[in-house]
Amino acid sequence: MNTLVNILFILVPLLLSVAYLTYFERKVLAAIQLRHGPSVVGPFGLLQPFADAIKLLIKEPIIPFRASTILFIMAPMLTFILALIAWAVIPFGAEVIVENGQQVIIPKVIANINVGVLYVLAISSLGVYGVIIAGWSSNSNYAFLGAIRSAAQMISYEVSIGLIVAAVVITTGTLNLGEMVVAKHNMPFWVDLLLMPIGIIFFISLLAETNRHPFDLPEAEAELVSGYNVEYSSMPFALFFLGEYANMILASAMMTIFFLGGWYPPLEFSLLYKIPGLIWFVLKIVILLFIFIWIRATIPRYRYDQLMRLGWKVFLPISVLWVILISGVLLFTGNLPGSNV
């Protein structure tokens, strides 16, 4: 029963967050472009996400004549479900209890497993299958080309993401996401400075991994007419749409855990610790989501060759070099977990 309550406690706010992220994006883009944005449905346009959802619900789903029906329907469901189940291991706070006279920090998470990092990486890697299935089953040249682009792009940047996460794991000595946040919080400040350059690379790689601007080549409107989801309408299209925004929130949560201190306040002031950790966690995610949208409004789209060159010839060598550098520095200074055993 407690597990079900925890799942609902995560799932319901997450679905509402995904819905209102679309509203937030339209409002931010409108402000940057000196427009009003959604302002008709409800006060300040706050009911616009529900109006969009109702519109998509009552529209008729159209399946192309030559499409593989089962795979065509399964692809958006797979994409959306994978974006949600990754949250099972994301810690959004912690509580401190006393056992045998010692303080023990217990993360607030649905499944506090010791291989949480591997779980998140595995689930995020599976997302490419939904895109590939959608492109192939649509029997459309535009959709298939968009799916191939997406697969190549996601696989290319997953290599850098994996190496950067490996550097964080080496630094903290754990694959448990909650323990990782606590370990990073207790480390010297210079370790955070050492991780900062690859933190920037990690965030840029997340833009490519989530197919967001300026790396949204799989759904380049001018070339591929929306890309891999061009044949979708009604709720199947909405599931792809929600999956993309759910992945944005998940990517921001991963960035927060790996590099921004998770639920801890940014500065060591006792006054800041009176604010609940959940508030800090959500605030950091919102700031990162704003940066996602800000980048979309200001930076032009990369060419495909530039995208591949950046991933393989720039990010990959830097990531490999930084893993070696961090390991050497931590070993030399005696801060490498397990080096003094």
Swiss-Prot record:
A GO-annotated cellular component: plasma membrane
EC number(s) from the headed UniProt entry: 7.1.1.-
Catalytic activity: a quinone + NADH + 5 H(+)(in) = a quinol + NAD(+) + 4 H(+)(out)
PROSITE patterns xref list: COMPLEX1_ND1_1 (PS00667), COMPLEX1_ND1_2 (PS00668)
Subcellular location: Cell membrane
Function: NDH-1 shuttles electrons from NADH, via FMN and iron-sulfur (Fe-S) centers, to quinones in the respiratory chain. The immediate electron acceptor for the enzyme in this species is believed to be ubiquinone. Couples the redox reaction to proton translocation (for every two electrons transferred, four hydrogen ions are translocated across the cytoplasmic membrane), and thus conserves the redox energy in a proton gradient. This subunit may bind ubiquinone.
Self-association and partners: NDH-1 is composed of 14 different subunits. Subunits NuoA, H, J, K, L, M, N constitute the membrane sector of the complex.
Protein name, entry field: NADH-quinone oxidoreductase subunit H
Taxonomic classification: Bacteria, Pseudomonadati, Pseudomonadota, Alphaproteobacteria, Rickettsiales
